[in-house]
């Protein structure tokens, strides 16, 4: 069943964090969001009359998910009507935008000291035509996650999409890092305040994992590491 698959994946992901290194927290960031994607599934644009699917999703989110999450020792809170404040999203310096929308918040306080917050999120630019009508141009639509690490990390690292979103992104005013993997650089641009630590974090295994995830899911993602937090966003749309 879907719930059974979710349970197995969640247990495996929690088991893997026992062996955390700083680098493997990247993998955890991907895993924790992937397993939650099917449960963050509310439409952005609602009609006045809810469809059967929307009613099912609403009941599933408000009743089934909270009961299921209560089975774990880790403190996990699912809040479908809460949102992540835009100031937190802005800390990641992903892009400039005009409008911001967030809902479906899930918080996890894990026993190893890592805290995870994720939300369904959307940003847009707005324009006004000659007739005074406002038009919304979508920049990001997907899942945004913050992972708070128990250890202090004072460096800054940005993992930005190489081409597709470059015109929309904020380009960091720090050094662009050149890596050994040409394949990886075809997917991402890396900016960091410390090239040595960047090489230690982005090992060949981690880079291969990111490429495989991108190719197998078709979901673009970007990441910021700063102030002992990992900010990661998945261009997943409505899952």
Which residues does each predicted region cover?
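Charged, low-complexity intrinsically disordered regions
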Residues: 66, 70-74, 78-239
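Active-site-proximal cofactor/substrate-binding loop regions of enzyme domains
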Residues: 1-5, 27-34
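Transmembrane-cytosolic junction motif
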Residues: 32-64
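Serine/threonine-rich low-complexity intrinsically disordered regions
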Residues: 15-17, 36, 45, 49-51, ...
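Hydrophobic alpha-helical transmembrane segments
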Residues: 11-31
